[in-house]
Each structure stands twice: as C-alpha cells, then as structure tokens.
A protein has these predicted regions:
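Sec/Tat signal peptide C-region and signal peptidase I cleavage site
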Residues: 20-26
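A bilobed periplasmic-binding-protein/Venus flytrap-type ligand-binding module shared by bacterial periplasmic
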Residues: 135-142, 178-181, 257-269, 287-288
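Early extracytoplasmic/lumenal segment of secretory-pathway proteins
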Residues: 27-93
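Extracellular/periplasmic bilobal clamshell ligand-binding domains
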Residues: 305-346
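Mature extracytoplasmic/periplasmic domains
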Residues: 263-321
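A ligand-binding cleft/hinge motif common to bilobed small-molecule-binding domains
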Residues: 89-93, 220-221, 225-243
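Periplasmic-binding protein-like
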Residues: 132, 196-201, 209, 240-264
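Extracytoplasmic ligand-binding site segments that recognize negatively charged/polar headgroups
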Residues: 38-44, 80-81, 85-223
Length: 346
C-alpha cells in the first residue's frame, strides 16, 4: 500500500504518457480513471494494455492525491471519471458525500476470490483491491523485552523512545483509538479518559512524524526505538537499521485498505464493473505483488517468502487484522485533532 507516499500534480493525462503507450485511435468510448499517478509503466503493462483488449476503449487518467481528486469529483457532482482509487478514509468521505454508486456484487465475479474483509469494507460500495496494516515496529537490538502488545507503548522503559504518526496522517487517529483501548473505554464515547491515556504516553514520545521518510530518519539516527507505522515503511526502516522488527501483537494489527469505486456520474458503468473485476483477478494481483506495486488481496496469489516479506499477505496474517469504522473516526477527527494538539503542543 503506497498511496500515502506519492502525491502527483493533479492533471488529466493520456495513456500515451504511461510507458510510451501508443496514442488511442478510433475507440468509441473514453474510460476515465482517477488515480494517484505512481508506477505508471507497471500499471500500463499489467493493467491498462491488457484491459484495452477487453474494453476496446481509450483510457485517460485524472491524477493527484486523495483529497484533491475527491474534491474535484465533488465539485463536478460525481461526474468526469468512471472509477476512482482512494485510501479507505477518503473513500468513506466520498460515500458520505454521495459521490459513488452502490455496487452490484454479482457483476464482479472475482470478488469471491478476495479476502472477505475486502469485499465490502464500507458497506454497499466499492471493494478493496489491496491491503496493508498499521502496527508497531521496534529495534530488537535495543528493546528488551520485545514488543508484544499495543499496551507496551506505555512501558516505563520506553521513555523518550517512541514515535507516533501525526494526528492528521492516515495512521494518526488510530493512535487515539489504541489509547482509548488502553484506558478501557470507547474512544468515540469517552474522549476525556482516552486523552488522559494519550497524555500518559507523552513522556515516551520523542516526536510525532508526518511522513515515512521522516520516520526512517528518526530510526536511522537512533532517536527512536519504537514506532507506530504502516507496513510499507518497514523495508526502508530495515535498510537503515537491520534490527528493526515488526512486532507480533497479541491484539493484532489494524487493517488499512485502498478501495476502488464507481463514481455516481460514470458514463461507462458496465466498463467500470469489468475494470474492477479485472484488477481483482489473480493474474493482475500476482503481477502487481511480484513487482512491488501493491499487496495482493486475491487469495489465490502465491508468493515466495522473499516476495511476501514486504506485504500483508496470507490468510493467517490477514485474518488477524481488525477493521476500524471510518464513519465514526471521520466524525470524531476534528475534536481529536484539537485535543491531540493540546497534548503535544504543550
């Protein structure tokens, strides 16, 4: 899952800009995909060129970060693109804004091949096409005993050793959720006790990070020995410090997914269903995983241990993940941001 790491200039680009593909000729339809804009050559080879043979259509892209693309779709009242790739928190916003069509799962045969948590992660709307996780990483050479629980973040021996994601990042609000669980309360219902737990954690926190590269720098300089992180940062952290280890938490990690939805103003709904079905297929998912693009959500994908080590992969690992309610989290986020800043702004 790499969406959060790549922010491209928001623009509509033709297929010709992706890997030098030939200019579309006399196709009768134009199929528009809203997408981040990274790994263009691989997407062209693995998805676009093969799908063109199915759709006999011209394919164009609107690229940019989650917020920009969703805002453009909202300003156009759901028109202008056929399908839109988004991270789960932003697709929840799109659902609440009425930007997407409800999904008829019978039109996506490959849904039966993906992990159950990805089939309808946000109710009646689009499926997940890749999966990741948020958990804890630690330097096994410096942290003893090992990290085995979310509650270990509050351990006295980890004073000035921890880094948390900033509250406005993808994983930041999940730190608040874990603080509520540590306090034994529902973080949505009892913010007072939840943020007392956040306050109690403050002495262990060296710095809150806002980007993966910032976290890697904190790890490489030795300032941080434990961090809450998304799994896509692990390889970079291990390149900096070989002993950085993904913790096996008794409560499990938190699932993150990227979704694909059909915009409510799509002019090519049948093609949109075919496209979604295509990217969920075993063949496409296998190539994307092997080439380091996205973690597979299709259960039939087979990876070697070396290929799998960078991904959230396999029934056991996926089965241990917990999903969060983005509708609740998005509703609480404004208050959480204010209270978080009160704690860490002191």
């Amino acid at each position: 899952m790499k969406a959060a790491r790549f922010i491209q200039m928001a623009t509509v680009i033709s297929l010709a800009t992706l890997g030098g593909a030939a200019t579309a000729s006399a196709q009768s339809k134009t199929f528009t995909i809203s997408w981040w804009g990274y790994n263009g050559e691989k997407m062209n080879a693995n998805i676009i060129e093969p799908f063109k043979k199915i759709c006999d259509c011209n394919i164009v892209f609107e690229t940019g970060n989650n917020a920009d693309r969703l805002n453009k779709l909202k300003l156009r009242d759901g028109k202008g693109v056929d399908v839109i790739y988004l991270s789960d928190s932003f697709s929840q916003q799109g659902i609440e804004q009425g930007m997407f069509k409800e999904i008829d799962q019978s039109k996506i045969p490959n849904l039966k091949e993906i992990y159950e948590l990805g089939r309808a992660p946000q109710g009646k709307y689009g499926p997940a096409y890749t999966i990741g996780r948020v958990g804890l990483v630690y330097d096994s050479a410096k942290v003893n005993p090992p990290i085995t629980s979310w509650n270990d973040l509050w351990r006295p021996d980890l004073k000035s050793a921890v880094s948390l994601p900033g509250i406005t990042t993808t994983a930041g609000p999940m730190a608040v959720i874990q603080a509520g669980k540590h306090a034994g309360v529902d973080p949505y219902a009892d913010t007072e006790k939840t943020f007392k737990a956040v306050e109690a954690l403050k002495s262990n926190v060296v710095k809150n990070y806002n980007t993966g590269s910032e976290l890697v720098n904190l790890i490489s300089t030795g300032e941080v020995r434990v961090a809450m992180a998304q799994d896509f940062t692990l390889a970079s952290m291990q390149a900096a410090v070989k002993t950085m280890t993904w913790a096996k938490l008794k409560e499990g990690d938190i699932a993150t997914v990227n979704t694909i939805n059909i915009s409510k103003g799509s002019e090519n709904v049948d093609l949109a269903y075919k496209f979604i079905d295509f990217i969920l297929s075993k063949d496409v998912q296998q190539k994307e995983a092997e080439q380091g693009v996205d973690a597979p959500i299709n259960t039939k994908v087979q990876l070697t241990p070396d290929q799998a080590k960078i991904w959230t992969y396999g029934a056991e690992q996926v089965g241990s993940l917990s999903l969060i309610s983005y509708s609740k989290m998005n509703a609480a986020k404004t208050e959480w941001i204010d209270q978080w800043n009160e704690v860490f702004g002191k």
